[in-house]
A protein has these predicted regions:
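A membrane-interface helix-boundary motif in multi-pass transporters
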Residues: 1, 201-231
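C-terminal membrane-cytosol helix-exit motif in multi-pass small-molecule transporters
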Residues: 1-18, 238-243
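Juxtamembrane intracellular "pre-TM" segments in multi-pass secondary transporters
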Residues: 14-49, 255
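Short amphipathic helix-loop junctions that connect adjacent transmembrane helices
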Residues: 64-87
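Helix-to-loop junctions at the C-terminal end of transmembrane segments
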Residues: 102-115, 201
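Structural signature of the two symmetry-related core transmembrane helices
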Residues: 118-133
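Intracellular juxtamembrane helix-capping segments at the cytosolic ends
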Residues: 156-170
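Loop-to-transmembrane helix entry/capping segments in MFS-fold secondary transporters
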Residues: 171-184
Length: 255
């Protein structure tokens, strides 16, 4: 992280051509993003908000329970994994990280070249297929295979949706949308997602485990990935509407 920060200090340049936000009334600015007229004027931005809200909700259906699922439902032991951390693995680790960074850069260039129309739906497909596959994998080895499309789709879809939100946010009103952004990015997903996951795990749990607090809890079950996949499919709805409006265009942004 430190190395990436140092590299970014010298390689990333802020745009100096942006429009400065004007000082306004605090209370008016606070409710700005909730105004129906603002929602209508920036319809693509709010469609992107809905898409990322559904995406993050799908993630929160399974993510809070993932480590517990691996440990108690699949019998995965973190100590066993540490046994594979040998000297050659440590030597190879930096090269793997460099390769991942290169892949991210290439994905960014690919998005710029062919646009979001195709890659967005590819990302949704990868993420959803990975979730469906994970719901049928009942050993750690098989789960690892399903994790490849799952987390590849997760990373790509996150990049795509975040860049879409950025593209549709008016430059001179960026701060005015940060509050409403956090509602869609964090508040709703972190309430709804874990609630769905908890209900599914209680309904289909194969047993219980004793947590660090000494209390008995339901074991997370594979069905939570299926529930997450169903939520992930809903991301298609705002994305299809965005595509019809022209996902690579931001003509409805009002400044």
């Amino acid at each position: 992280v430190i190395v990436c920060g140092i590299l970014g200090l010298f390689t990333l340049k802020d745009s100096r051509s942006g429009v400065h936000e004007k000082n306004g009334n605090y209370w008016k600015d606070l409710i700005y993003g909730f105004k129906p007229s603002v929602v209508k004027e920036n319809s693509k931005l709010y469609l992107a908000f809905i898409a990322i809200c559904l995406f993050q909700t799908a993630v929160q259906v399974f993510f809070p329970y993932l480590l517990i699922y691996l440990q108690h439902s699949l019998g995965f032991n973190i100590e066993d994994l540490l046994g594979y951390v040998t000297k050659p693995v440590l030597i190879a680790a930096p090269f793997v990280i460099i390769a991942l960074v290169a892949v991210i850069v290439l994905v960014g260039k690919l998005i710029d070249k062919i646009g979001k129309n195709i890659l967005l739906f590819v990302a949704i497909a990868l993420f959803t297929v990975g979730l469906f596959a994970a719901s049928f994998m009942h050993t750690a080895g098989k789960f690892a295979l399903s994790a490849i499309p799952l987390f590849a789709g997760y990373g790509l879809l996150g990049i795509m949706l975040n860049s879409t939100v950025r593209d549709y946010t008016p430059e001179d009103k960026t701060g005015l949308f940060q509050g409403i952004r956090m509602i869609f990015f964090v508040l709703i997903p972190m309430i709804v997602g874990p609630s769905i996951g908890d209900r599914v795990c209680k309904a289909y749990a194969g047993g219980t485990y004793v947590g660090d607090d000494g209390l008995s809890n339901y074991e997370p079950c594979a069905q939570m990935f299926l529930a997450a996949a169903i939520v992930a499919l809903l991301v298609l709805i705002p994305c299809i509407i965005l595509r019809k409006k022209g996902i690579n265009k931001n003509t409805d942004i009002k400044e």
